[in-house]
C-alpha cells in the first residue's frame, strides 16, 4: 500500500479517535452529574455506612463499587476503541478472549491500587483541614514516584512477556548509549507486543535500580539497528535533560493547582448539594467532577509542556547518534506501522497531542545540523 493511501487510513483512524475522545468526555461528565443529582452516591454511601462505623471501611467498600461500576459503564467504549477499532484498521493481533483477560487484569489493578489510594486520600481529607489540597498533592506525588519505579518490574509484566534481548550487538550499542548520558541500566529487554498489536514501541523505563531499556518485538522485527538506536537515543535524551524530574515537578505543580481548584469547587458545591464535609464519601463524584474538569482545562498546557520536552529529546537523539537519515527513516516507519497521522490539524495537535506531529519532527530533522 503506498504512503498516500496509508496516510488516508491514518487520518480516518485519527478522526475516529478524536470523536471517541469527545464521546468519552461527555459520557464521563454525564455519569458524574447523574450520580450526584440522582443521589446514587448518597444511596451507596448510606449502604456502606450501614455496614460499619469505620470510615476506612466506608471508603474501601465505596471505592470497590465505584471502580467495578466504572469498568462496566465504560466497557462498550473500551471494546469499540481498544478492540473493534484496532481490528478494523488491521492493527490488532489480540483475540477477544485475550482482550477480555486484559480488561480483567486492568480491573484488578485498579482495585489493588485505586482503593488504597482513595482510602489514604480520604484520611488526608479528614485530617488536613484547610491544607487538605497540599496533603493530597503530596500523596499523589509519592504515588507517582513509586509507580514510575515499579512500572517496569510489576505492572508491565502483567500484560506483556519480557525477556533479555538476545541481539548482543544491539544490546552493547544501547548500553553504551546509556552510559554516554550517564544512565545505569539494569538490562535491555525484548517485550512481546506482537501477541497483542502490530504497533511498535520502545521505552527507557523505571527509576534508580529499576531503570531498563525495553524494546517491543514489533520494533525489533521491522526496524534496522541504526533506526532502533536513534529511537532509544530519543528516550535517553529525556534522561539526559532530566525530563523525568521535570515532568514530575510539572505534574506536581499542576496537581496542587488542580486540587486547590477542586477544594474551592467542593466547598462551593457542598452547600448546594447538602454535604456537610469535604471528607463525606457521598461527595466523591463532586470531587471527581472538579478534578476532571480541571484536567480538561489544563490538558492543552500540559501537552504543550510535553511537546517542548519532546523537541529537546529529538535534538539529543540527533546529537548522540549523528544519524539524521536514520532518525527520519524511523519517524516515517513509526507513522506507517502505528498508523499515525503525519500532519494532524494544528488545533487537534495543540489540544490533544503530547508529541509534536511526525511531519514537523521530520521537517525539523531535515534542517538539523550538528553545530
Located regions from the model:
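Polar-ligand-bearing catalytic/cofactor-coordination segments
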Residues: 1-278, 292, 297-371
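Alpha-helical transmembrane segments
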Residues: 286-290
Amino acid at each position: 500500500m503506498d504512503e498516500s493511501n496509508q496516510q488516508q487510513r491514518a487520518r480516518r483512524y485519527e478522526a475516529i479517535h478524536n470523536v471517541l475522545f469527545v464521546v468519552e468526555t461527555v459520557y464521563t461528565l454525564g455519569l458524574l452529574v447523574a450520580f450526584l443529582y440522582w443521589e446514587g452516591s448518597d444511596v451507596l454511601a448510606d449502604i456502606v455506612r450501614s455496614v460499619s462505623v469505620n470510615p476506612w471501611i466506608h471508603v474501601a467498600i465505596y471505592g470497590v463499587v465505584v471502580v467495578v461500576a466504572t469498568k462496566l459503564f465504560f466497557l462498550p467504549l473500551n471494546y469499540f476503541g481498544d478492540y473493534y477499532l484496532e481490528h478494523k484498521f488491521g492493527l490488532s493481533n489480540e483475540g477477544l478472549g485475550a482482550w477480555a483477560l486484559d480488561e480483567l487484569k486492568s480491573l484488578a489493578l485498579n482495585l489493588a491500587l485505586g482503593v488504597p489510594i482513595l482510602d489514604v486520600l480520604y484520611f488526608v481529607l479528614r485530617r488536613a483541614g484547610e491544607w487538605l489540597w497540599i496533603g493530597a498533592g503530596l500523596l499523589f506525588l509519592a504515588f507517582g514516584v513509586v509507580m514510575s519505579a515499579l512500572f517496569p518490574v510489576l505492572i508491565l509484566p502483567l500484560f506483556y512477556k519480557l525477556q533479555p534481548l538476545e541481539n548482543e550487538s544491539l544490546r552493547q550499542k544501547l548500553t553504551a548509549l546509556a552510559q554516554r548520558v550517564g544512565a545505569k541500566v539494569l538490562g535491555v529487554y525484548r517485550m512481546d507486543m506482537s501477541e497483542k498489536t502490530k504497533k511498535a514501541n520502545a521505552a527507557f523505563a523505571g527509576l534508580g535500580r529499576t531503570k531498563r531499556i525495553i524494546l517491543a518485538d514489533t520494533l525489533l522485527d521491522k526496524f534496522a539497528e541504526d533506526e532502533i538506536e536513534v529511537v532509544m537515543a530519543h528516550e535517553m535524551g529525556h534522561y539526559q535533560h532530566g525530563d523525568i524530574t521535570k515532568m514530575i515537578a510539572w505534574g506536581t505543580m499542576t496537581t496542587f493547582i488542580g486540587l486547590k481548584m477542586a477544594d474551592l469547587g467542593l466547598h462551593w458545591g457542598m452547600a448546594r448539594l447538602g454535604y456537610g464535609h469535604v471528607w463525606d464519601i457521598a461527595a466523591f463524584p463532586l470531587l471527581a467532577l472538579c478534578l476532571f474538569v480541571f484536567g480538561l482545562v489544563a490538558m492543552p498546557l500540559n501537552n504543550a509542556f510535553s511537546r517542548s520536552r519532546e523537541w529537546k529529546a529529538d535534538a539529543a537523539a540527533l546529537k548522540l547518534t549523528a544519524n539524521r537519515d536514520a532518525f527520519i527513516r524511523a519517524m516515517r516507519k513509526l507513522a506507517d506501522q502505528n498508523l499515525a497521522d503525519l500532519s494532524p490539524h494544528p488545533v487537534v495537535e495543540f489540544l490533544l497531542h503530547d508529541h509534536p506531529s511526525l511531519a514537523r519532527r521530520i521537517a525539523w530533522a531535515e534542517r538539523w545540523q550538528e553545530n
